[in-house]
């Protein structure tokens, strides 16, 4: 497809065009050589074709079918040349391969002068369609120029076809778009769809002016509907008021006619004759009743007119304060369902207002007599509607009350939960504070202990350094210090008379540089010996207590043996003791022992009590100033032995053998217990009753 004129088309390198041009040049040269000879007529010449084919070429060469460039350059000379050559291009359109045969010579029907003129001007005006021509002069067009024109026409035809295809596609797309928009308009006009759908459709397309226009039209329609509804509402209001006034007027007219009739009847009765007194009285009563009825009706009419006037003033004031323009401007952005809901709400409010007005006007209307039955019958229908509304409102109020109670219960439950959570929170906070305080105390203790450890470690280091210095300065001091703290275990009383300077007497006189070290070593030796002495003293006290207990049990055993040998089954004699001393010793058997009645436990208790009582009696008789502390310790041990019951004999079995000082402690005992000190055997108390009193 070529996009230029005839010359660029020839320059593109088309083989067919170049071949045609070469043939035409060769033919022109041959014609110039054979100038005097007439050109031979070709059997396939387009000039010898039928004249009926000219119409088809003329139809191609018309101004409407040619491109704009061809129309601008169309001149009468070209038209004359086109008409002078009938059928010149019909075969070119039908068979493009016959171009080299179609223009081999000048047609035979042409005059000689024209042929000479064409031959003279032919080399100068070649490719006139591409190079241009001088207007007003006849131009002979060669087949190359005609070929260029045909190519241009084909190009224009192809362009027009492509334009037609493009327009068809555009038309199809526009039809699809129109159908889609029609569907969208139908969806928008559908009242079942919501406002969100309309807004999303309006927001999806940036060029949604048609949607906006449609919405505006809908808004206008809805505004008109709202105006119509307002008009109907106002008409209903005015009709209601006028009907009430009309009814009152009709009632007044009827009453007036009735009064007039009664007056005429009264006058006729007076003219006809005298009536009895009863009839006169009834007529007077009727007149009074009618007068009172007229007065009440006039009052009610006056009240109704005043009410009508006040309602008109209220309506004017409402209309002045709330203009319809602002309402319509507010309603413009509303959707159809929302407007319908608003209309329903307004109708409900209007019905409520009418019901309230009717309730307010009921006491006023109660004054007329019962002859207004027709007017009351007219108001019965809205009262039924009002009753329905009241029932519905009562049901709604009942539901709201139930919901309120349920919500109050839920609120109370939530309050309780909140209180519980707050209490738990307070408890947790207290626990957290306690934990923090404990943590702080623990940290303080740790810090104190760390400080003590640091001080002790520092002291230990100092002592170690001092010891090293002492060892370096005077190595003889440690050897004598080791010899001193090795006393014999039998020298108990000599430890009390240990001279404080005995460690220093055996040592040589200290030299001046190590005198402090010697003093420290002596102090350490004294401290060690004092600790050993205290330990031994405590051990001696415990040994004495153990010896006393052993002696008591031995004496008891000997007594039991003697008594058993004398009289089997008699109770052992019990020495009466002080109540304060023996108060912890006698214990009543437990309820379990009494319930079971086992004689073994009773015998064990009796044995322990008797042994301790005997020991206390002996201690009272043999009490001296030297053994007061020993007696107190034995009382404490006896009290602990009574609480332990059967656990005391294992304690006695675990005690070590008495020291050599044991016989000295038992020396003041009476003569009947002399045999108790001869044996060193440890007696277990619970085993005695089993041997003496087998069950």
UniProtKB/Swiss-Prot annotation:
It is found in: Cell projection, Cilium membrane. Keywords: Cell membrane, Cell projection, Coiled coil, Membrane, Phosphoprotein, Repeat. It comes from the Eukaryota. InterPro entries: CellDiv_DevSignal_Domain (IPR052318), IQ_motif_EF-hand-BS (IPR000048). GO terms for biological process: limb morphogenesis. Residues 157-264, 292-358, 387-477 form a coiled coil. Residues 542-571, 601-630 form the IQ domain. Residues 29-55, 357-390, 465-521, 564-599, 618-695 are annotated as: Disordered. Pfam families: IQ. It is a peripheral membrane protein. The modification Phosphoserine is found at residue 322. GO terms for cellular component: ciliary membrane; cilium. Residues 465-482 have a biased composition (Basic and acidic residues). It is linked to Polydactyly, postaxial, A7: A form of postaxial polydactyly, a condition characterized by the occurrence of supernumerary digits in the upper and/or lower extremities. In postaxial polydactyly type A, the extra digit is well-formed and articulates with the fifth or a sixth metacarpal/metatarsal. PAPA7 is an autosomal recessive condition characterized by postaxial polydactyly restricted to the feet. PANTHER family: IQ DOMAIN-CONTAINING PROTEIN E, MYOSIN MOTOR DOMAIN-CONTAINING PROTEIN. Component of the EvC complex composed of EFCAB7, IQCE, EVC2 and EVC; built from two subcomplexes, EVC2:EVC and EFCAB7:IQCE. Interacts (via N-terminus) with EFCAB7 (via EF-hands 1 and 2); this interaction anchors the EVC-EVC2 complex in a signaling microdomain at the base of cilia and stimulates the Hedgehog (Hh) pathway. Interacts with EVC2 (via N-terminal end). Interacts with EVC. Component of the EvC complex that positively regulates ciliary Hedgehog (Hh) signaling. Required for proper limb morphogenesis. This is IQ domain-containing protein E. The gene is IQCE.
């Amino acid at each position: 497809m070529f996009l230029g004129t005839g010359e660029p088309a020839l320059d593109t390198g088309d083989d067919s065009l170049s071949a045609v041009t070469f043939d035409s040049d060769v033919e022109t040269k041959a014609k110039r050589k054979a100038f005097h000879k007439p050109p031979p007529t070709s059997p396939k010449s387009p000039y010898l074709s039928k004249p009926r084919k000219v119409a088809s070429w003329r139809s191609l060469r018309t101004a409407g079918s040619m491109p704009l460039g061809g129309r601008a350059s169309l001149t009468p000379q070209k038209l004359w040349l086109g008409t002078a050559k009938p059928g010149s291009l019909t075969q070119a359109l039908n068979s493009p391969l016959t171009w080299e045969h179609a223009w081999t010579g000048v047609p035979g029907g042409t005059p000689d002068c024209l042929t000479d003129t064409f031959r003279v001007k032919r080399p100068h005006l070649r490719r006139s369609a591409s190079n241009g021509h001088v207007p007003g002069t006849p131009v002979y067009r060669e087949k190359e120029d005609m070929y260029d024109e045909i190519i241009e026409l084909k190009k224009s035809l192809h362009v027009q076809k492509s334009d037609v295809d493009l327009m068809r596609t555009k038309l199809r797309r526009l039809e699809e778009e129109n159908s889609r928009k029609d569907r969208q308009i139908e969806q928008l006009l559908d009242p079942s769809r919501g406002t969100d759908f309309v807004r999303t459709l309006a927001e999806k397309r940036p060029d949604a002016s048609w949607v906006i226009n449609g919405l505006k039209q809908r808004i206008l329609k809805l505004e008109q509907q709202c105006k119509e509804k307002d008009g109907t509402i106002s008409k209903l209001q005015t009709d209601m008021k006028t009907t009430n006034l009309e009814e009152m007027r009709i009632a007044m007219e009827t009453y007036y006619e009735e009064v007039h009739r009664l007056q005429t009847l009264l006058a006729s009765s007076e003219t006809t004759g005298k009536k009895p007194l009863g009839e006169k009285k009834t007529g007077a009563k009727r007149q009074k009743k009618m007068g009172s009825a007229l007065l009440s009706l006039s009052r009610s009419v006056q009240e109704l007119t005043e009410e009508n006037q006040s309602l008109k003033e209220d309506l004017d004031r409402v209309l002045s304060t709330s203009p319809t323009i602002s309402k319509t401007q507010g309603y413009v952005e509303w959707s159809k369902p929302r407007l319908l809901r608003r209309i329903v709400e307004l109708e409900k409010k209007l019905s409520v207002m009418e019901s309230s007005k009717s309730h307010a006007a009921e006491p006023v209307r109660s004054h007329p007599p019962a002859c207004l039955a027709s007017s009351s019958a007219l108001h019965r229908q809205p009262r039924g509607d009002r009753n329905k509304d009241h029932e519905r409102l009562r049901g709604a109020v009942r539901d709201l009350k139930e919901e309120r109670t349920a919500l109050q219960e839920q609120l109370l439950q939530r309050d309780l939960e909140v209180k519980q959570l707050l209490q738990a929170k307070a408890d947790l906070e207290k626990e957290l504070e306690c934990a923090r305080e404990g943590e702080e105390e623990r940290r303080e203790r740790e810090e104190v202990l760390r400080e003590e450890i640091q001080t002790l470690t520092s002291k230990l280091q100092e002592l170690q350094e001092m010891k090293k210095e002492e060892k370096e300065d005077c190595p003889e001091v440690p050897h004598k210090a080791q010899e001193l703290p090795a006393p014999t275990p039998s020298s108990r009383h000599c430890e009390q008379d240990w001279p404080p300077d005995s460690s220093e007497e055996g040592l040589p006189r200290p030299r001046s540089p190590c005198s402090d070290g010697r003093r420290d070593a002596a102090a350490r030796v004294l401290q060690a010996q004092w600790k050993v002495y205290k330990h031994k003293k405590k051990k001696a006290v415990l040994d004495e207590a153990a010896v006393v207990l052993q002696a008591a049990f031995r004496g008891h055993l000997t007594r039991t043996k003697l008594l058993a040998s004398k009289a089997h089954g008699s109770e052992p004699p019990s020495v009466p003791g002080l109540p304060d001393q023996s108060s912890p010793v006698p214990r009543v058997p437990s309820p379990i022992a009494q319930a079971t009645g086992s004689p073994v436990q009773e015998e064990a208790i009796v044995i322990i009590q008797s042994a301790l009582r005997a020991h206390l009696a002996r201690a009272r008789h043999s009490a001296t100033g030297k053994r007061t502390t020993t007696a107190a310790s034995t009382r404490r041990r006896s009290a602990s032995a009574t609480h332990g019951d059967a656990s005391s004999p294992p304690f006695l079995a675990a005690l070590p053998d008495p020291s050599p000082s044991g016989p000295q402690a038992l020396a003041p005992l009476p003569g009947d217990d002399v045999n108790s000190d001869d044996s060193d055997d440890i007696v277990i108390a619970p085993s005695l009753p089993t041997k003496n009193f087998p069950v």
